[in-house]
Curated annotation (Swiss-Prot):
It comes from the Eukaryota. Disruption phenotype: Knockout mice are born at the expected Mendelian rate. Mutant mice have grossly distorted lenses due to defective orientation and migration of secondary lens fibers associated with impaired anterior and posterior sutures formation. Mice exhibit neuroanatomical abnormalities characterized by defective dendritic spine morphology and misoriented cortical and hippocampal neurons, causing profound deficits in learning and memory. One of its GO terms (cellular component) is filopodium. This is Abl interactor 2. It is found in: Cell projection, Lamellipodium; Cell projection, Filopodium; Cytoplasm, Cytoskeleton; Cell junction, Adherens junction. Expresses in embryonic and adult brain. In adult brain prominently expressed in the neocortex, hippocampus and dentate gyrus. It comes from Mus musculus. Residues 384-443 form the SH3 domain. InterPro entries: ABI, Abi2_SH3, Abl-interactor_HHR_dom, SH3-like_dom_sf, SH3_domain, T_SNARE_dom.
Length: 446
């Protein structure tokens, strides 16, 4: 405050007086220089002296103006700071007044209200009576509670009597049919066909139960034994007088010893034989086609073969009245072969029970059949093939590039496609067929 007062009373008025004095002094200097330049004989010297006065006068005036300007700016700064302090004081007074007004308003509002006493409590309150902990009781785990849930196949254990075996139904769907490619070529480069249901096998109308026969023991039997997974078949045929050949279907059940579980063996179906009138009913092995058949000699028999797992004991049982017989479907349209050789089948001592397995619902079975191509392949068989399979269901082709076959037909597989279809040769004809309608053939010899 004293500084501002000194500026206002002393320095700023002193600067103004100095400027007025400089003004009057400059007028006198100007008159002197003019007269000196006119009267002096040395014009050059007079001119130089005039220049020196002019420069000094300009410097003096500039200094005085600068001093006065600084004093004025300093005065303005001091006044601005004082104004800020005054503004702050006024704001403080205004806030104080507002606070006082709010207090008065709250007091007036409080007069119109009543006091309420609130008790403070904890957010979590412990229960007054503690619950007794429940004792843990262990319950056994039921591993079969989810057996009927989902799309899995539930296998039921069946007590199979000797000689009886339920027929397996054919698959309801076959693999996606391959497209119709070029002329006669087999390919899978076109879109697949839609899945079509396959009709199940039907028992023929001329089904005749087998008559009761006595089984005579023999040392040799022209049959092959092979084990399959839960499917046993014995193929036989009975002749009738008058040249008629009624087809019958039978199945026999055998329990093999250890080593016969889990070996998948396909079962071929023999072709219909030709039995002359008067010949007794007899068992016989599936004959070769007429094109490769040689008349057997009476009393002769094929060498007996059995798998190594049941070399000790073999049981061939045929049921009376219920003895299942399989229908003999022809493999080709060749003439019927000559009458077969009488080959009695005998019963040996029952085999030992199978060893205990982890899976109780799967049982090993022995299938007896005679493979017509066991010794050598027919002339129409390809030189190189992947495996030889036998049809386990009847199949009728839907397109020209497929094969039609009946149960027991022998097919030589030359290619396996990724979509489940096989390419094979049957009776000299090459075509496609579903892979789930056949099973592989495995031969065992001593």
């Amino acid at each position: 405050m004293a500084e501002l007062q000194m500026l206002l009373e002393e320095e700023i008025p002193g600067g103004r007086r100095a400027l007025f004095d400089s003004y009057t002094n400059l007028e006198r200097v100007a008159d002197y220089c003019e007269n000196n330049y006119i009267q002096s004989p040395d014009k050059q010297r007079a001119l130089e002296e005039t220049k020196a006065y002019t420069t000094q006068s300009l410097a003096s005036v500039a200094y005085l103006i600068n001093t006065l300007a600084n004093n004025v700016l300093q005065m303005l700064d001091i006044q601005a700071s004082q104004l800020r302090r005054m503004e702050s004081s006024i704001n403080h007074i205004s806030q104080t007044v507002d606070i006082h007004k709010e207090k008065v308003a709250r007091r007036e509002i409080g007069i119109l209200t009543t006091n309420k006493n609130t008790s403070r409590t904890h957010k979590i309150i412990a229960p007054a009576n503690l619950e007794r902990p429940v004792r843990y009781i262990r319950k056994p785990i039921d591993y079969t509670i989810l057996d009927d849930i989902g799309h899995g196949v539930k296998v039921s254990t069946q007590n199979m009597k000797m000689g009886g075996l339920p027929r397996t139904t054919p698959p309801t769907q076959k693999p996606p049919s391959p497209p119709m490619s070029g002329k006669g070529t087999l390919g899978r480069h076109s879109p697949y066909r839609t899945l079509e249901p396959v009709r199940p096998p039907v028992v023929p109308n001329d089904y005749v139960p087998s008559p009761t026969r006595n089984m005579a023991p023999s040392q040799q039997s022209p049959v092959r034994t092979a084990s399959v997974n839960q499917r046993n078949r014995t193929y036989s045929s009975s002749g009738s007088s008058g040249g008629s050949h009624p087809s019958s279907r039978s199945s026999s059940r055998e329990n093999s010893g250890s080593g016969s579980v889990g070996v998948p063996i396909a079962v071929p179906t023999p072709s219909p034989p030709s039995v002359f009138p008067g010949h007794p009913v007899q068992f016989y092995s599936m004959n070769r086609p007429a094109s490769r058949h040689t008349p057997p000699t009476i009393g002769g028999s094929l060498p007996y073969r059995r798998p190594p797992s049941i070399t000790s004991q073999t049981s061939l049982q045929n049921q009376m009245n219920g003895g299942p017989f399989y229908n003999q479907n022809p493999v080709s349209d060749t003439p019927p072969p000559p009458p077969p050789v009488e080959e009695p089948v005998f019963d040996e001592s029952p085999p030992p029970p199978p060893p205990p397995e982890d899976y109780e619902e799967e049982e090993a079975a022995v299938v007896e059949y005679s493979d017509p191509y066991a010794e050598e392949d027919p002339p129409w068989a390809p030189r190189a093939y992947l495996e030889k399979v036998v049809a386990i269901y009847d199949y009728t082709k839907d397109k020209e590039d497929e094969l039609s076959f009946q149960e027991g037909a022998i097919i030589y597989v030359i290619k396996k496609n990724d979509d489940g279809w096989y390419e094979g040769v049957m009776n000299g004809v090459t075509g496609l067929f579903p892979g789930n309608y056949v099973e592989s053939i495995m031969h065992y010899s001593e």
